[in-house]
Regions:
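Residue-level signature of catalytic and energy-coupling elements of molecular machines
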Residues: 14, 169, 207
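Juxtamembrane "helix exit" motif at the C-terminal ends of alpha-helical transmembrane segments
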Residues: 75, 115-139, 215-239, 246, ...
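Select subsegments of transmembrane alpha-helices in polytopic membrane proteins
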Residues: 105-123, 204-215
Length: 260
């Protein structure tokens, strides 16, 4: 299997595919017609080459994927707004008047920051607090770190299971599998057509979900080694080490994606 460098994600009723600075989004509209949008995005690691250094680039690559993903998702959502939702409220009109063309970028930034804070709280700090309850009966730091890691993975799995029960999310997950099929079709040297895509696997090594799982596993190794005396230092370490863990995880996933 040949590495293609192509990535992507599912959006509302469609998929986004990216190769280098170029990306395209295909969305099936309510009338059944498929709308395609092509665009470019220059990575921050291209603008500032020193950010592309191994173990540093992972964080910025993740940020790039978040930005492109949000742009694609926002565009796909625009086809499914109700007439009532399409009408701007007075507050929305005021925001549009104050910020103008920058409004979409500002709102996207706010959503990304809020999502990041929520993710830290749910997947990094909550497992730490839950495992801390067992501190009196489990004196071993190593066992505590492993327990925290397993709780973190359990919370993530439960979260995925819960959201996948929602019809809209379930359908989006199906498109996520379609994205994997397209990439696998290309990387196996097959012509990109419906028959070959259908026959391709819906699993892929460079999947974003795999990245999150790798982050969680590697975080166990980090927190087994790094010892802190107080709960406050534990909180700080969980937050401060996120870029480091993400950087190591990215290199691992990148290596695995390029080798069978």
């Amino acid at each position: 299997m040949k590495y293609s460098g192509i990535g992507g994600q599912a959006v509302i009723e469609g998929i986004m595919m990216q190769n280098g600075e170029n990306y395209a989004v295909a969305v099936r509209k309510p009338d059944g017609e498929i709308e395609v949008k092509k665009d470019t995005y220059r990575s921050v690691t291209k603008k500032y080459p020193f950010l592309g250094i191994p173990f540093i680039r992972g964080v910025f690559k993740f940020a790039d994927s978040m930005i492109v993903g949000m742009r694609a998702l926002t565009w796909s959502c625009s086809f499914f707004e109700d007439d009532e939702d399409a009408k701007e409220s007075r507050f929305e009109q005021w925001l549009d008047k104050v910020f103008g063309e920058k409004l979409e970028s500002i709102l996207m930034t706010v959503v990304m920051i809020f999502s990041f804070i929520m993710a830290i709280g749910i997947f990094m700090l909550l497992p730490m607090f839950i495992s801390n309850i067992c501190k009196k009966v489990i004196p071993s730091h190593t066992v505590m770190a492993i327990l925290e890691g397993f709780i973190r993975i359990a919370i993530f799995v439960i979260y995925i299971k819960m959201v996948s029960r929602m019809e809209d999310i379930k359908r989006t997950f199906m498109y996520h599998g379609s994205e994997h099929k397209c990439i696998n079709c290309i990387e196996h040297g097959l012509e990109l057509n419906v028959a070959n895509v259908r026959a391709s696997s819906k699993e892929h090594k460079r999947c974003g979900t795999s990245f999150i799982m790798i982050v969680m596993v590697i975080s166990i190794l980090f927190f087994v080694v790094i010892r802190t005396d107080t709960i406050w230092l534990r909180i700080v370490s969980r937050i401060v080490l996120i870029p480091v863990i993400a950087g190591v995880s990215y290199e691992f996933l990148s290596f695995a994606g390029k080798h069978d």
